């Protein structure tokens, strides 16, 4: 599967055409809702081993809901993580490739039944080092590696995703400026289109405390970065973050926040957020119009969002 073979297009070309795109929603929490036990360091990557066809069905449900981009189940699919299960590196990288094939099969089946549908893309998920630690570090960014160590950690999965034919990389849930620098170098090394999406400490800073303006300057200078944004964040932080990014870059922006609940990394449970989301919107659909006005060209959902949520966002997109 060549990176542009499905429709002869790319994310940047779709954005250049003026399209506003709907990204899919949660994978892991949707799998949990369908009966999967993900209390495991591999998280959704566990299902690649045990029930891969269920992953494909979730991808298909999001395409049916109106998503134009599917994010693969490779967020925590790493040779280092699979090695803890006694899985050899070659077999682990084959599981990374499987995550791409499952999304692509769902796309092809959807297009076979909906031949007039527009281009659909498969984004290869590249989660942060903190996700591998499985201790909530992706919301703090308090781990320290050298640039070389970050690159050596991420390179095998990125190589496997690119070889399997992803249309772009979704470098997502990033809490660390230093890690983003290393990933940008790998994007250049593999000459692959990407988006970069960050977790937040507050509306003006990513989780490690770096101002969003600095993040935007870093990513905005890389031509293979098609969009910059935030994900896996509370709904009420999206608007201030988009404002900060919009003031610092001309790149298209993206946002795919959580459903409105907050995650307790200690108990590994989701809890209702007090105070009506701190004055923010109560749902993706409620926030989407505002986020679009603030420059978000790609909008979707992260943890605890569902195909129903994505369908509501897609309906708003078609009305614009």
PLM segments and residue spans:
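Domain-level signal for soluble alpha/beta catalytic cores
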Residues: 1-320
């Amino acid at each position: 599967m060549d990176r542009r073979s499905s429709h002869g297009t790319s994310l940047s070309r779709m954005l250049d055409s003026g399209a506003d795109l709907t990204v899919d929603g949660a994978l892991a929490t949707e799998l949990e809702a369908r009966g999967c036990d993900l209390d495991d360091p591999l998280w959704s990557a566990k299902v690649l081993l045990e029930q891969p066809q269920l992953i494909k069905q979730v991808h298909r449900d999001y395409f049916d809901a109106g998503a134009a981009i599917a994010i693969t189940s490779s967020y925590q699919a790493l040779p280092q993580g699979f090695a803890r299960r006694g899985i050899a590196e070659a077999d682990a990288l084959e599981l990374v490739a499987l995550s791409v094939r499952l999304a692509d099969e769902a796309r092809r089946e959807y297009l076979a039944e909906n031949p007039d549908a527009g281009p659909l893309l498969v984004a290869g998920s590249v989660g942060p080092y903190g996700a591998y630690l499985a201790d909530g570090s992706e919301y703090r960014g308090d781990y320290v590696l050298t640039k070389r160590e970050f690159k050596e950690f991420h390179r095998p999965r990125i190589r496997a995703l690119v070889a399997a034919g992803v249309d772009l990389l979704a470098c997502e849930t990033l809490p660390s400026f230093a890690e983003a620098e290393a990933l940008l170098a790998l994007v250049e090394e593999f000459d692959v289109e990407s988006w970069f999406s960050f977790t937040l400490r507050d509306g003006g800073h990513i989780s490690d405390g770096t101002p969003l303006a600095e993040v935007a300057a870093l990513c905005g200078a890389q031509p293979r970065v098609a969009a910059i944004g935030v994900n896996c964040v509370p709904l009420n932080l999206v608007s201030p973050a988009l404002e900060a990014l919009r003031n610092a870059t001309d790149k298209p922006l993206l946002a795919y926040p959580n459903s409105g609940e907050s995650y307790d990394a200690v108990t590994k449970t989701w809890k209702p957020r007090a105070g009506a989301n701190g004055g923010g919107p109560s749902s993706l659909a409620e926030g989407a119009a505002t986020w679009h006005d603030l420059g978000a060209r790609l909008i979707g959902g992260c943890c605890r969002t569902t195909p129903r949520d994505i369908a509501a966002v897609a309906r708003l997109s078609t009305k614009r």
